[in-house]
UniProtKB/Swiss-Prot annotation:
Keyword Ribonucleoprotein: yes
Organism placement in taxonomy: Eukaryota, Viridiplantae, Streptophyta, Embryophyta, Tracheophyta
Organism: Lepidium virginicum
Subunit structure: Part of the 30S ribosomal subunit.
Protein name from the UniProt record: Small ribosomal subunit protein uS8c
Gene: rps8
GO-annotated biological processes: translation
Length: 134
């Protein structure tokens, strides 16, 4: 049975966000680095740094939390894995879904790398729908 690194990163971020943790540590792979760069660029996380421990690289993510007037934390991150190893979901450029009317993003794996739905529509390419983030 193989590991699903995308599901692992999504679950780690979701659990840390629900438990109001400030940081998350995930294993560094090419796919996770691409997804984290998109999350950083879109403003879903604050900071990323690479850490080496016992000849393995890890990414330390600093999550973005929002406080309301009662000084309690409000989670602002919702992630959902779409395509998985047992059921791959593909979409062409015309049928890429919009999340909350464009507020959320769809992360796709295309022939030109991992990118958001807006970039894929602009380049008119489709691919495998990895996850939704809103």
């Amino acid at each position: 049975m193989g590991k699903d690194t995308i599901a692992d990163i999504i679950t780690s971020i979701r659990n840390a966000d629900m438990n109001r943790k400030g940081t998350v540590r995930i294993r560094s792979t090419n796919i996770t680095e691409s997804i984290v760069k998109i999350l950083l660029r879109e403003g879903f996380i604050e900071n990323v740094r690479k850490h080496r421990e016992n000849n393995q690289y890890f990414l330390i993510l600093t999550l973005r939390h929002k406080r309301n007037k009662k000084e309690s934390y409000k989670t602002i991150l919702n992630l959902k894995r779409i395509s998985r190893p047992g059921l791959r979901i593909y979409s062409n450029s015309q049928r890429i879904p919009r999340i909350l009317g464009g507020i959320g993003i769809v992360i796709l794996s295309t022939s030109q790398g991992i990118m958001t739905d807006r970039e894929a529509r602009r380049k008119s390419i489709g691919g495998e729908i990895l996850c939704y983030i809103w």
